[in-house]
Amino acid sequence: MKGKFIVFEGVDGSGKTTQIKLLGEKLESMGCPVVYTREPGGTRVGERIREILLNPLYGELVPWAEALLYAAARAQHVAQVILPALREGKVVLCDRFTDSSLAYQGYGRGVDIEMLEQVNRPAAAGVVPDLVLVLDFDREGQTERMARSGRSADRIEREAQEFYRRVRSGYLALAARAPRRYRVIDASRAEKLVHLDVLKAAEEVLDAFLKGNSRA
């Protein structure tokens, strides 16, 4: 694969969408071909699965059903979007990937981590991110802020603070397992400061790729 795969992870409200946009715009200004995508979603099938996963009407979803739906959306996403883009030499910026399943369904819901890894291995089809940016953020008070803004919380966002504390701890544990591939970034700071750290981490991974692209 000629492209690069950068994944943004973190609890809901950590600013992933904003930081993906900022990094993508910077890379595009440098002549880099960028693909923006997300999980669950990114494909027609994946977006329908996303509707089920995030709709509060389906609050009865049990943890394993939730985990398998995420894996199904991921398998479609990898085959239809991620792998083709990487083969074409593009930089794929993805909002969530396999670590979300481990953090949310594993650490958050208590689903066995090893079994989750076994399920997601074929779903990911051997694709491993070149860089995982974990935007570390304390979600305390986020539900109240959302209510004041007038936006209703989705099924996952309605979880209790203790759930999000477990998810956050899970992300930090995952990052500690492979520090060379992960960067934990304090997302509680100003947007511009977070972007500078994101850009620095991305440039370390993309250095040779960017040089090659500039010569093309």
Swiss-Prot record:
Catalytic activities: dTMP + ATP = dTDP + ADP
Keywords: ATP-binding, Kinase, Nucleotide biosynthesis, Nucleotide-binding, Transferase
Cross-referenced InterPro entries: P-loop_NTPase, Thymidylate_kin-like_dom, Thymidylate_kin_CS, Thymidylate_kinase
GO BP annotations, alphabetical order: dTDP biosynthetic process; dTTP biosynthetic process; dUDP biosynthetic process
Pfam family of the protein (one): Thymidylate_kin
Chain positions recorded as ATP binding sites: G10, V11, D12, G13, S14, G15, K16, T17
EC number(s) per entry: 2.7.4.9
Functional note: Phosphorylation of dTMP to form dTDP in both de novo and salvage pathways of dTTP synthesis.
Record-given protein name: Thymidylate kinase
Organism: Pelotomaculum thermopropionicum (strain DSM 13744 / JCM 10971 / SI)
